[in-house]
Curated annotation (Swiss-Prot):
Gene3D superfamilies: 3.30.300.20, Ribosomal protein S3, C-terminal domain. SMART domains: KH (SM00322). Keywords: Ribonucleoprotein, Ribosomal protein, RNA-binding, rRNA-binding. GO terms for molecular function: mRNA binding; rRNA binding; structural constituent of ribosome. This is Small ribosomal subunit protein uS3. One of its GO terms (cellular component) is cytosolic small ribosomal subunit. Residues 216-242 are annotated as: Disordered. Residues 39-110 form the KH type-2 domain. It comes from the Bacteria. It holds the Pfam family KH_2. Part of the 30S ribosomal subunit. Forms a tight complex with proteins S10 and S14.
Amino acid sequence: MGHKINPTGLRLGITQEHRSRWYASSKNYPALLQEDDRIRKFIHKKYGSAGISDVLIARKADQLEVELKTARPGVLVGRQGSGIEELRSGIQKTIGDSSRQVRINVVEVERVDGDAFLLAEYIAQQLEKRVAFRRTIRMAVQRAQRAGVLGLKIQVSGRLNGAEIARTEWTREGRVPLHTLRADIDYATKVASTTYGVLGIKVWVFKGEVLSEQAQPMPVGAAPRRRASRRPQQFEDRSNEG
């Protein structure tokens, strides 16, 4: 089951958060969902060179909050924040409401080579430049290992190296526990357009296990806490009273 289902959808509410955080009535829900999709497509199309990893959307009354996780925040912000104003007007034009309040928050990705979407984007760019897929995968694995990820799995499907018959190739380094729900797994897909057709790319990145406060691992060298001895209960025999 863990190998078939989308790892992000399986872990929503456990280790993953929803990309859209808002509530709506059944009447307005489809329109708002399509609006979120248009916003994400607009951002990825217009700012493809900014290395945008994720787009989080929240709604509060008439205010729309958009959080962008990017590897190059300077490309989005621009000089003196001019890029933010351009992005805000572009979002308002996309949703068809120029009076809507749009709040934009730009967050820089700390480990670029440890992000699944940015790794998939790097692989797609190399394949579109006609670099051999085995070398591309090897370089991506090396970059992820330098970023300190615990496990990585990469899968590429299609007419690899221009072969007549499409096939699927994959590689794995380290641990990628897809069946463990507490495992923090970053998953992303990307399509590379080549002269021989399209190639599908999937990337799984294992970043560690998310443990609750009650299940935190014991520090190295610390002695286990002994359970206090339970005092035996004492009962009084009052059957002969009264």
